[in-house]
Regions:
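N-terminal domain-onset segments
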Residues: 1-120
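Acidic, proline/glycine-rich low-complexity IDRs
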Residues: 106-147
Length: 147
């Protein structure tokens, strides 16, 4: 099977690690991960299916997903300045400028250019601070699954 992209827009938090962990917990509790739901539809919306967690913990869900991964943000354990497996790292200013024409992209700019996700390695994730009227308004997390 091929890798699957995933992405999320969430409310801005200055603590990126806390934002990631909150997002992981939200998606786990909603049951929006493989194998609870083998193939998710993005973007996640308020009316997206949420069957509830099918595992006791995120760790158990990751173990059960095995080499396929959860095909979701659950596969991303932490935030780092540098790309790596299981890590969310910031998209560089150069890439922000190249993909969106701005170092402070809006949610709309990112939403229109999701094809940039194809440049992300399997098992990796990036995050972007999105802006509205020059102020941080949200966070974008996007990556590619392992399988």
């Amino acid at each position: 099977m091929g890798a699957h992209p995933y992405y999320y827009f969430i409310k801005y938090q200055p603590d990126i690690e806390a934002a990631l962990q909150d997002l992981r917990q939200r998606e786990f509790e909603a049951g929006r991960y493989n194998p609870a739901q083998p193939f998710l539809r993005f973007p996640i919306r308020p009316d997206s299916p949420a069957p509830g967690a099918k595992h006791e913990s995120i760790y158990e869900a990751i173990e059960d997903a095995a080499e396929d991964g959860t095909r979701s943000i659950l596969d991303i354990e932490t935030v780092s300045d540098w790309p790596d497996f299981g890590v969310a790292s910031p998209l560089s200013e150069e890439d922000l400028q190249r993909y969106f024409g701005s170092k402070q992209p809006t949610k709309e700019m990112v939403s229109r250019k999701l094809d940039f996700l194809a440049s992300i390695e399997r098992g990796h994730c990036v995050y972007i601070t999105v802006f509205e009227s020059g102020q941080p308004s949200g966070l974008f997390f996007g990556g590619y699954s392992f399988d």
